C-alpha cells in the first residue's frame, strides 16, 4: 500500500513541479 501511495504522490509531485517549471519559462 505504501509503495503504491508513494508512487502516486511522486507522479503528482512530478506533474506539479513540471507545471511550475513551464510557468517560469
UniProtKB/Swiss-Prot annotation:
Keyword terms: Amidation, Antibiotic, Antimicrobial, Cytolysis, Hemolysis, Secreted, Toxin
Subcellular location: Secreted
Expression by tissue: Expressed by the venom gland.
GO CC entries: extracellular region
An annotated GO BP: killing of cells of another organism
Residue positions where Leucine amide is found in the record: 25
GO MF annotations in UniProt: toxin activity
Keyword Secreted among record annotations: yes
Family according to the record: Belongs to the cationic peptide 04 (cupiennin) family. 05 subfamily.
Function: Has antimicrobial activity against Gram-positive bacterium S.aureus (MIC=3.79 uM), Gram-negative bacterium E.coli (MIC=7.81 uM) and yeasts C.krusei (MIC=26.3 uM) and C.neoformans (MIC=13.2 uM). Has hemolytic activity against rabbit erythrocytes. Forms pores in lipid bilayers in vitro; pore formation is reduced when cholesterol is present in the bilayers.
Protein name: Toxin LyeTx 1
Organism: Lycosa erythrognatha (Wolf spider)
Biological classification of the source: Eukaryota, Metazoa, Ecdysozoa, Arthropoda, Chelicerata
